[in-house]
Amino acid sequence: FGYLADDADNIRMLRRAFESVQPGGRFALDFLNVPQIFRSFRGHEVTQRAGLTLTRDTRLDLARGLMHKRWQIDPGGIVRDTTVRAYQPHELVRLAEQAGFTDVALVGSIRGEPLELDSRRCILLARRP
């Protein structure tokens, strides 16, 4: 979810998730906490692990709400480009409700901690009526 730039595609994914949950069943979506990412944004990041160097360059498209990322793994020169929709928490709630979910809530961790600006994740919890 979120790796498609078009809202219609992402809402279609949520509707399919809704259809797969039994009535009364619960649904969880683990997503980026976009406010935290924007707050600590670094466009260029290099990580070294197990003899590999992973370079990530990220460009923000604030007008469209997208993060364009280029990943490079060396040695090997593997390059991959990805685009992630930078949904704000309130947008996730709106999309889940449009898909038919109710009792939508947001938490900041799998332990159920409150969603805050510094939370690393934004986890949406919802129910199919």
Can you say where each PLM-predicted feature lies in the sequence?
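Conserved short-loop catalytic and cofactor-binding motifs
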Residues: 1, 80-83, 111
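SAM-dependent methyltransferase
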Residues: 7, 28-95
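A short SAM/SAH-binding and catalytic strip from SAM-dependent methyltransferases
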Residues: 1-9
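Glycine-centered flexibility sites
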Residues: 2, 24-25, 108
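A short glycine-rich, Lys/Arg-flanked "PGG" loop and its adjoining helix->strand segment in the class I
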Residues: 11-26
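C-terminal lobe and adjacent flexible extensions of AdoMet/dcAdoMet transferase-like proteins
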Residues: 87-129
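A short hydrophobic/small-residue beta-strand
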Residues: 27-28, 103
